[in-house]
């Protein structure tokens, strides 16, 4: 009599991944209903003032385009962005990388203004957020910063669908490789909302179109990432969307241009290394020999 050993390690691994994400989704969904913590803004958690000419060490060369009128301000922004690169490195913790990329995105926002005196109210919030994150990174206080900061009062919640996607991605293993895209998308979305609140849809449309593309690509990547179950992802996204929709304005309305408190999020456990699933061996099945 011959004996055939049947193993199903691949199927077991896939099933365990689904179970892990499903359990996480259940925990997060429960937290959405029970946790009312305010995510706050980085600049509220760690307020920092701007000090002109204090951000370029002697060994760093700022990039200042020819013809720049207010060179000191532009140089400060350039030097801060250079300093953030060390915190964006792959070996850094995921929250450190995320905050560093977000600070860089805020500074990119601010860089569109010619000098500190010309900053709009929205740009001042952007600068304040960047300064606080930079300070937190330099002083090892990054864990004090919210993983998802609130929408500042110069903006409003116009696209709950995009925010729901970004919040959901943060709860999956895809957050690690998508950390820059998520950071850039959050700031760009707030930027678009600020443009809408100040100038209307005509001025904000280009920003929204950009975020639409970024988030759509990020979500597709997340759904194709190992360990992400599509059903659990969509269920969690639906929960976030239900939470956010009441905070959003009606179409073409500026009634929500007063900021918004977004759902509180902890750093996702699934973004960390997990032990490899054990191989499951099925019972030995005796098969009669043909001889």
Region roles according to the model:
Residues 16-19, 23, 32, 233, ...:
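Extended hydrophobic/Leu-rich segments
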Residues 4-24:
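Bacterial N-terminal signal peptides that target proteins for export
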Residues 29-38:
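C-terminal segment of classical bacterial N-terminal signal peptides
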Residues 13-14, 35-36, 290:
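Short stretches within intrinsically disordered, low-complexity N-terminal or propeptide regions
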Residues 38-291:
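Long, charged/polar, soluble alpha-helical segments
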């Amino acid at each position: 009599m011959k004996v055939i050993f049947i193993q199903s390690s691949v199927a077991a691994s896939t099933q365990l991944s689904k179970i892990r994400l499903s359990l996480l989704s259940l925990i997060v969904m429960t937290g959405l209903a029970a946790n009312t913590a305010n995510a706050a803004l980085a600049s509220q958690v760690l307020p920092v003032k701007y000090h002109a000419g204090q951000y370029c060490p002697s060994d760093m060369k700022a990039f200042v385009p020819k013809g720049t009128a207010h060179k000191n301000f532009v140089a400060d922004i350039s030097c801060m962005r250079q300093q953030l690169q060390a915190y964006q490195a792959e070996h850094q913790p995921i929250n450190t990388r995320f905050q560093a990329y977000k600070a860089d995105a805020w500074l990119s926002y601010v860089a569109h203004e010619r000098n500190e005196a010309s900053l709009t109210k929205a740009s001042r919030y952007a600068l304040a957020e960047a300064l606080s994150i930079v300070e937190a990174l330099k002083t090892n206080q990054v864990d004090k910063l919210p993983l998802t900061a609130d929408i500042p009062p110069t903006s409003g919640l116009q696209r709950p669908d995009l925010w729901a996607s970004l919040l959901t991605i943060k709860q999956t293993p895809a957050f690690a490789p998508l950390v820059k895209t998520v950071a850039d998308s959050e700031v760009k979305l707030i930027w678009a909302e600020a443009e809408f609140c100040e100038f209307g849809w005509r001025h904000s449309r280009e920003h929204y179109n950009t975020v639409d593309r970024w988030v759509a690509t990020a979500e597709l990547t997340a759904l194709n990432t190992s360990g992400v179950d599509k059903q659990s992802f969509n269920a969690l996204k639906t929960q976030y969307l239900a939470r956010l929709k009441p905070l959003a304005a009606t179409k073409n309305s500026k009634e929500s241009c007063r900021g918004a408190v977004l759902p509180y999020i902890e750093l996702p456990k699934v973004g960390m290394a997990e032990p490899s699933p054990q191989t499951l061996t099925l019972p030995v099945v005796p098969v009669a020999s043909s001889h």
